[in-house]
Design a protein with these regions (language model features):
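N-terminal capping segment at the start of a domain
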Residues: 1-23, 290, 349-351
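A non-catalytic alpha/beta surface segment that caps or lines the substrate-entry region
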Residues: 18-65
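Active-site metal-coordination/substrate-binding segment of hydrolases
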Residues: 26, 51-52, 59, 65-128, ...
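Acidic, glycine-rich active-site loops and adjacent beta-strand->loop/helix elements
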Residues: 46, 75-77, 132-140, 162-164, ...
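Acidic-glycine-rich active-site phosphate/pyrophosphate-binding loop
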Residues: 78-91, 169-181, 309, 340
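Glycine/charged-rich beta-loop-alpha catalytic/anionic-binding loops adjacent to active sites
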Residues: 88-100, 183-187, 314, 346-349
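Acidic/histidine-rich catalytic neighborhood of metal-dependent amide-processing enzymes
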Residues: 99-173, 215, 232-233, 241-244, ...
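Metal-dependent amide/peptide-bond hydrolase catalytic core
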Residues: 199-378
Length: 378
Protein backbone atom coordinates (compact mmCIF):
# COMPACT_ATOMS: atom_id res chain seq x y z
CA UNK A 1 0.00 0.00 0.00
CA UNK A 2 1.31 3.41 -0.92
CA UNK A 3 1.37 5.89 1.94
CA UNK A 4 2.72 9.36 1.15
CA UNK A 5 3.25 10.28 4.80
CA UNK A 6 5.22 7.12 5.60
CA UNK A 7 7.25 7.40 2.39
CA UNK A 8 8.00 11.02 3.19
CA UNK A 9 9.06 10.30 6.77
CA UNK A 10 11.31 7.47 5.58
CA UNK A 11 12.90 9.67 2.92
CA UNK A 12 13.71 12.29 5.57
CA UNK A 13 15.30 9.91 8.10
CA UNK A 14 17.54 8.60 5.31
CA UNK A 15 19.17 12.05 5.04
CA UNK A 16 22.14 12.28 7.42
CA UNK A 17 21.76 15.31 9.68
CA UNK A 18 23.74 14.92 12.88
CA UNK A 19 24.09 18.21 14.77
CA UNK A 20 26.24 20.81 12.93
CA UNK A 21 25.79 18.86 9.66
CA UNK A 22 22.23 19.76 8.77
CA UNK A 23 22.98 21.15 5.27
CA UNK A 24 21.58 18.26 3.19
CA UNK A 25 18.44 18.06 5.30
CA UNK A 26 18.01 21.86 5.22
CA UNK A 27 18.30 21.95 1.42
CA UNK A 28 15.76 19.18 1.08
CA UNK A 29 13.31 21.04 3.34
CA UNK A 30 13.89 24.32 1.50
CA UNK A 31 13.03 22.63 -1.81
CA UNK A 32 9.97 20.83 -0.43
CA UNK A 33 8.57 23.89 1.35
CA UNK A 34 9.16 26.15 -1.66
CA UNK A 35 7.31 23.68 -3.90
CA UNK A 36 4.38 24.00 -1.49
CA UNK A 37 4.33 27.77 -1.96
CA UNK A 38 6.34 28.97 1.01
CA UNK A 39 8.93 31.70 1.01
CA UNK A 40 12.05 30.14 2.56
CA UNK A 41 15.01 31.92 4.14
CA UNK A 42 17.97 30.91 6.29
CA UNK A 43 19.59 32.95 9.03
CA UNK A 44 23.32 32.99 9.72
CA UNK A 45 23.23 31.22 13.11
CA UNK A 46 25.77 28.67 11.87
CA UNK A 47 28.42 31.40 11.73
CA UNK A 48 28.26 31.32 15.54
CA UNK A 49 27.45 27.63 16.10
CA UNK A 50 30.11 26.33 13.68
CA UNK A 51 27.58 24.28 11.73
CA UNK A 52 27.22 24.10 7.94
CA UNK A 53 23.81 25.82 7.54
CA UNK A 54 21.61 28.23 9.52
CA UNK A 55 18.05 27.97 10.84
CA UNK A 56 15.34 27.61 8.19
CA UNK A 57 12.31 29.91 8.29
CA UNK A 58 9.43 29.24 5.88
CA UNK A 59 6.41 31.52 5.50
CA UNK A 60 3.14 30.33 4.04
CA UNK A 61 0.92 33.29 3.16
CA UNK A 62 -2.47 32.90 4.80
CA UNK A 63 -5.78 32.68 3.07
CA UNK A 64 -7.44 34.46 6.00
CA UNK A 65 -6.38 37.67 7.78
CA UNK A 66 -4.69 36.57 11.00
CA UNK A 67 -1.43 36.70 12.86
CA UNK A 68 0.82 33.84 11.73
CA UNK A 69 0.88 30.52 13.57
CA UNK A 70 4.30 29.00 14.18
CA UNK A 71 5.32 25.36 13.87
CA UNK A 72 8.83 24.42 15.00
CA UNK A 73 10.94 21.31 14.80
CA UNK A 74 14.69 20.69 14.69
CA UNK A 75 16.70 19.55 11.69
CA UNK A 76 19.46 17.77 13.60
CA UNK A 77 19.65 14.32 15.16
CA UNK A 78 21.85 12.79 17.83
CA UNK A 79 24.56 10.23 17.00
CA UNK A 80 24.86 7.58 15.64
CA UNK A 81 22.74 9.06 12.88
CA UNK A 82 24.61 8.32 9.65
CA UNK A 83 23.33 5.92 6.98
CA UNK A 84 20.01 5.25 8.72
CA UNK A 85 18.17 2.28 7.21
CA UNK A 86 14.52 2.37 8.27
CA UNK A 87 12.68 -0.94 8.65
CA UNK A 88 8.90 -1.40 9.01
CA UNK A 89 7.85 -4.08 11.51
CA UNK A 90 4.27 -4.69 12.70
CA UNK A 91 3.07 -1.21 11.84
CA UNK A 92 6.08 0.49 13.40
CA UNK A 93 9.14 2.07 11.85
CA UNK A 94 12.55 1.26 13.38
CA UNK A 95 16.17 1.67 12.29
CA UNK A 96 18.11 -1.51 11.44
CA UNK A 97 19.47 -1.44 15.00
CA UNK A 98 22.87 0.07 14.22
CA UNK A 99 21.77 3.73 14.37
CA UNK A 100 19.08 5.90 15.88
CA UNK A 101 16.01 6.37 13.68
CA UNK A 102 15.81 10.16 13.78
CA UNK A 103 12.11 10.24 14.54
CA UNK A 104 13.34 12.89 16.99
CA UNK A 105 12.62 15.18 15.27
CA UNK A 106 11.82 14.11 11.71
CA UNK A 107 8.43 12.79 12.78
CA UNK A 108 7.65 16.40 13.73
CA UNK A 109 8.87 17.72 10.38
CA UNK A 110 7.00 15.08 8.36
CA UNK A 111 3.76 15.67 10.27
CA UNK A 112 3.94 19.47 9.84
CA UNK A 113 4.62 19.18 6.10
CA UNK A 114 1.96 16.52 5.49
CA UNK A 115 -0.64 18.48 7.48
CA UNK A 116 -0.07 21.61 5.37
CA UNK A 117 -0.11 19.57 2.14
CA UNK A 118 -3.45 18.00 3.03
CA UNK A 119 -4.97 21.36 3.97
CA UNK A 120 -3.83 22.75 0.62
CA UNK A 121 -5.38 19.79 -1.17
CA UNK A 122 -8.63 20.34 0.75
CA UNK A 123 -8.49 24.03 -0.31
CA UNK A 124 -8.86 24.96 3.34
CA UNK A 125 -8.53 28.69 4.07
CA UNK A 126 -5.77 28.65 6.66
CA UNK A 127 -4.13 31.47 8.62
CA UNK A 128 -0.55 32.47 7.72
CA UNK A 129 1.84 29.74 8.87
CA UNK A 130 5.51 30.04 9.74
CA UNK A 131 7.65 26.92 9.91
CA UNK A 132 10.90 27.19 11.84
CA UNK A 133 13.38 24.33 11.51
CA UNK A 134 16.31 24.84 13.86
CA UNK A 135 19.84 23.53 13.78
CA UNK A 136 21.86 21.88 16.57
CA UNK A 137 19.05 21.55 19.10
CA UNK A 138 20.51 18.35 20.46
CA UNK A 139 23.85 19.87 21.43
CA UNK A 140 22.58 22.72 23.59
CA UNK A 141 19.72 24.44 21.73
CA UNK A 142 22.33 26.28 19.68
CA UNK A 143 20.08 27.13 16.73
CA UNK A 144 17.37 28.61 18.95
CA UNK A 145 19.94 30.51 21.03
CA UNK A 146 21.50 32.05 17.91
CA UNK A 147 18.35 32.53 15.84
CA UNK A 148 17.76 35.89 14.15
CA UNK A 149 14.42 36.60 15.85
CA UNK A 150 13.72 39.56 13.55
CA UNK A 151 12.88 37.00 10.86
CA UNK A 152 9.95 35.57 12.83
CA UNK A 153 6.58 37.30 12.85
CA UNK A 154 4.63 34.71 14.86
CA UNK A 155 4.31 35.06 18.62
CA UNK A 156 2.50 31.79 19.27
CA UNK A 157 2.67 28.28 17.91
CA UNK A 158 3.87 24.78 18.66
CA UNK A 159 7.08 22.80 18.78
CA UNK A 160 6.64 19.25 17.54
CA UNK A 161 9.22 17.51 19.68
CA UNK A 162 7.69 15.32 22.34
CA UNK A 163 6.25 11.84 22.72
CA UNK A 164 2.58 11.07 23.17
CA UNK A 165 0.07 12.36 20.61
CA UNK A 166 -2.41 14.60 22.39
CA UNK A 167 0.02 15.82 25.03
CA UNK A 168 1.10 19.45 25.22
CA UNK A 169 4.05 20.33 27.44
CA UNK A 170 3.55 23.82 28.82
CA UNK A 171 6.15 24.04 31.57
CA UNK A 172 9.84 23.26 31.55
CA UNK A 173 12.51 24.13 34.13
CA UNK A 174 15.40 26.53 33.89
CA UNK A 175 18.88 25.11 34.24
CA UNK A 176 22.09 26.45 35.73
CA UNK A 177 25.33 24.63 35.01
CA UNK A 178 27.85 25.09 37.83
CA UNK A 179 31.57 24.55 37.41
CA UNK A 180 33.69 24.55 40.54
CA UNK A 181 37.44 24.51 40.84
CA UNK A 182 38.86 23.87 44.30
CA UNK A 183 42.46 24.97 44.72
CA UNK A 184 44.53 23.73 47.67
CA UNK A 185 48.26 23.37 47.99
CA UNK A 186 50.49 20.57 46.77
CA UNK A 187 52.90 18.77 49.13
CA UNK A 188 54.50 15.33 49.58
CA UNK A 189 52.03 13.28 51.58
CA UNK A 190 54.70 11.30 53.43
CA UNK A 191 57.50 13.79 53.92
CA UNK A 192 55.57 16.97 54.73
CA UNK A 193 51.78 16.61 54.76
CA UNK A 194 51.49 19.64 57.04
CA UNK A 195 52.71 21.79 54.12
CA UNK A 196 49.74 20.86 51.94
CA UNK A 197 46.05 21.71 51.63
CA UNK A 198 44.07 18.74 50.35
CA UNK A 199 41.63 19.92 47.66
CA UNK A 200 39.90 16.53 47.56
CA UNK A 201 39.22 16.68 51.29
CA UNK A 202 37.85 20.20 50.98
CA UNK A 203 35.61 19.26 48.05
CA UNK A 204 34.36 16.18 49.87
CA UNK A 205 33.49 18.18 52.97
CA UNK A 206 31.63 20.79 50.94
CA UNK A 207 29.69 18.17 48.94
CA UNK A 208 28.70 16.34 52.12
CA UNK A 209 26.99 19.53 53.32
CA UNK A 210 24.96 20.02 50.11
CA UNK A 211 21.39 19.00 49.64
CA UNK A 212 21.30 17.17 46.31
CA UNK A 213 18.74 15.23 44.31
CA UNK A 214 15.14 16.36 44.55
CA UNK A 215 15.01 19.55 46.57
CA UNK A 216 11.26 20.05 46.20
CA UNK A 217 8.51 19.47 43.65
CA UNK A 218 9.96 22.08 41.32
CA UNK A 219 13.68 21.85 41.94
CA UNK A 220 16.54 19.35 41.58
CA UNK A 221 20.30 19.61 42.09
CA UNK A 222 23.17 17.34 41.13
CA UNK A 223 26.95 17.15 41.27
CA UNK A 224 27.65 15.06 38.18
CA UNK A 225 31.41 15.11 37.64
CA UNK A 226 34.50 15.23 39.82
CA UNK A 227 38.10 15.09 38.81
CA UNK A 228 41.30 15.61 40.73
CA UNK A 229 44.55 14.33 42.14
CA UNK A 230 47.77 13.15 40.54
CA UNK A 231 49.32 10.43 42.69
CA UNK A 232 48.87 8.62 45.99
CA UNK A 233 51.87 10.35 47.51
CA UNK A 234 50.88 13.88 46.57
CA UNK A 235 48.44 16.02 48.48
CA UNK A 236 46.17 17.13 45.63
CA UNK A 237 46.05 20.85 44.91
CA UNK A 238 43.25 20.95 42.33
CA UNK A 239 39.83 19.33 42.11
CA UNK A 240 37.34 20.20 39.38
CA UNK A 241 33.66 19.50 39.85
CA UNK A 242 30.57 20.25 37.86
CA UNK A 243 26.89 19.94 38.43
CA UNK A 244 23.54 21.50 37.73
CA UNK A 245 20.44 22.95 39.31
CA UNK A 246 17.03 22.82 37.64
CA UNK A 247 13.84 24.51 38.74
CA UNK A 248 10.47 25.58 37.41
CA UNK A 249 10.88 28.64 39.65
CA UNK A 250 13.57 31.19 38.83
CA UNK A 251 13.66 32.20 42.49
CA UNK A 252 14.37 28.69 43.73
CA UNK A 253 16.93 28.16 40.99
CA UNK A 254 18.85 31.16 42.23
CA UNK A 255 18.48 30.20 45.88
CA UNK A 256 19.78 26.65 45.44
CA UNK A 257 22.60 27.79 43.14
CA UNK A 258 23.70 30.39 45.69
CA UNK A 259 23.52 27.81 48.46
CA UNK A 260 26.00 25.61 46.59
CA UNK A 261 28.35 28.54 45.97
CA UNK A 262 28.15 29.66 49.62
CA UNK A 263 28.83 26.13 50.93
CA UNK A 264 32.03 25.82 48.91
CA UNK A 265 33.22 29.30 49.82
CA UNK A 266 32.56 28.82 53.53
CA UNK A 267 34.19 25.40 53.60
CA UNK A 268 37.25 26.79 51.83
CA UNK A 269 37.71 29.41 54.57
CA UNK A 270 38.46 26.66 57.07
CA UNK A 271 41.35 25.36 54.96
CA UNK A 272 44.43 27.45 55.57
CA UNK A 273 47.93 26.81 56.85
CA UNK A 274 50.71 28.94 58.21
CA UNK A 275 54.06 28.16 56.62
CA UNK A 276 57.31 29.96 57.35
CA UNK A 277 55.37 33.03 58.52
CA UNK A 278 53.11 33.07 55.50
CA UNK A 279 49.41 32.15 55.36
CA UNK A 280 48.24 29.86 52.56
CA UNK A 281 44.50 29.75 51.93
CA UNK A 282 42.44 27.36 49.86
CA UNK A 283 40.46 28.97 47.06
CA UNK A 284 37.36 28.13 45.08
CA UNK A 285 36.62 29.38 41.58
CA UNK A 286 32.97 29.01 40.65
CA UNK A 287 31.38 29.65 37.29
CA UNK A 288 27.61 29.57 36.78
CA UNK A 289 26.14 29.38 33.28
CA UNK A 290 22.45 29.79 32.59
CA UNK A 291 21.90 27.02 30.08
CA UNK A 292 18.25 27.75 29.47
CA UNK A 293 15.50 29.78 31.14
CA UNK A 294 12.23 28.31 32.42
CA UNK A 295 9.08 28.08 30.32
CA UNK A 296 5.73 28.57 32.02
CA UNK A 297 2.69 28.79 29.77
CA UNK A 298 -0.69 28.93 31.50
CA UNK A 299 -2.99 26.06 30.60
CA UNK A 300 -5.80 28.59 30.06
CA UNK A 301 -3.91 30.35 27.30
CA UNK A 302 -5.66 30.17 23.97
CA UNK A 303 -2.70 28.48 22.29
CA UNK A 304 -2.91 25.60 24.78
CA UNK A 305 -6.68 25.37 24.64
CA UNK A 306 -6.64 25.16 20.84
CA UNK A 307 -4.30 22.14 20.97
CA UNK A 308 -6.45 20.38 23.57
CA UNK A 309 -9.68 21.06 21.71
CA UNK A 310 -8.15 19.91 18.43
CA UNK A 311 -7.08 16.62 20.04
CA UNK A 312 -10.60 16.09 21.40
CA UNK A 313 -12.08 16.81 17.96
CA UNK A 314 -10.21 13.84 16.53
CA UNK A 315 -10.87 11.54 19.50
CA UNK A 316 -7.41 11.71 21.03
CA UNK A 317 -7.15 12.22 24.76
CA UNK A 318 -5.75 15.69 25.44
CA UNK A 319 -3.26 16.21 28.26
CA UNK A 320 -1.07 19.03 29.55
CA UNK A 321 2.36 18.06 30.83
CA UNK A 322 5.25 19.48 32.80
CA UNK A 323 8.71 18.56 31.59
CA UNK A 324 11.93 18.04 33.54
CA UNK A 325 14.13 18.98 30.59
CA UNK A 326 14.74 21.98 28.36
CA UNK A 327 14.21 22.38 24.63
CA UNK A 328 14.14 25.09 21.96
CA UNK A 329 10.76 26.12 23.40
CA UNK A 330 12.48 27.41 26.57
CA UNK A 331 14.58 29.78 24.47
CA UNK A 332 11.58 30.90 22.38
CA UNK A 333 9.65 31.59 25.59
CA UNK A 334 12.43 33.87 26.84
CA UNK A 335 12.08 35.80 23.54
CA UNK A 336 8.34 36.26 24.05
CA UNK A 337 7.22 33.43 21.76
CA UNK A 338 4.91 30.89 23.35
CA UNK A 339 5.13 27.38 21.93
CA UNK A 340 3.74 24.41 23.85
CA UNK A 341 5.62 21.23 22.90
CA UNK A 342 3.42 18.64 21.26
CA UNK A 343 3.88 14.89 21.05
CA UNK A 344 4.59 13.44 17.61
CA UNK A 345 4.50 9.74 18.52
CA UNK A 346 8.30 9.38 18.75
CA UNK A 347 9.39 6.62 21.13
CA UNK A 348 12.62 5.45 22.80
CA UNK A 349 14.42 8.45 21.34
CA UNK A 350 18.21 8.72 21.47
CA UNK A 351 18.51 4.91 21.45
CA UNK A 352 19.02 2.28 18.77
CA UNK A 353 15.44 1.10 19.47
CA UNK A 354 13.96 4.48 18.57
CA UNK A 355 10.67 3.99 16.72
CA UNK A 356 7.30 5.41 15.76
CA UNK A 357 4.08 3.70 14.79
CA UNK A 358 2.48 4.48 11.44
CA UNK A 359 -0.76 5.10 13.31
CA UNK A 360 0.91 7.80 15.42
CA UNK A 361 2.47 9.47 12.37
CA UNK A 362 -1.02 9.63 10.92
CA UNK A 363 -2.63 10.89 14.15
CA UNK A 364 0.09 13.49 14.64
CA UNK A 365 -0.64 14.82 11.16
CA UNK A 366 -4.38 14.90 11.80
CA UNK A 367 -3.81 16.70 15.09
CA UNK A 368 -1.76 19.45 13.42
CA UNK A 369 -4.38 19.83 10.66
CA UNK A 370 -7.08 20.17 13.28
CA UNK A 371 -5.03 22.72 15.24
CA UNK A 372 -4.54 24.86 12.11
CA UNK A 373 -8.26 24.62 11.39
CA UNK A 374 -9.22 25.66 14.93
CA UNK A 375 -6.74 28.55 14.90
CA UNK A 376 -7.79 29.74 11.45
CA UNK A 377 -11.50 29.65 12.28
CA UNK A 378 -11.14 31.58 15.54
ZN1 LIG B 1 14.05 16.56 19.75
Amino acid sequence: MKNRLVDYFISLVKIDSESKNELAMAERMRDDLMKMGAQVIFDDAHARTKGNIGNLIARFPGKVEKKPLLFCAHLDTVKPGKGIKPVIKNGKIFSDGTTILGTDDKSGIAEIVEAIRRLQEEHFDYAPIEVLLTISEEIGLLGAKNLDYSLLNAKVGYALDSHRIGSATIQAPSLNVIEIKVIGKEAHSGACPERGINAIELAAEAISKLKLGRIDKETTANIGKINGGVANNIIPNIVSLSGEVRSHSEEKLEKVTNEIIRTFEETAQKYQINLDGKVYKAKVDIKVDRDFPAMKIDSNEQIVQIALKAAKNINIEPKVEISGGGSDANIFYSKGIKVPILGTGMRDVHTLDENISIEDLENGTRWIMEIIKEYSKM
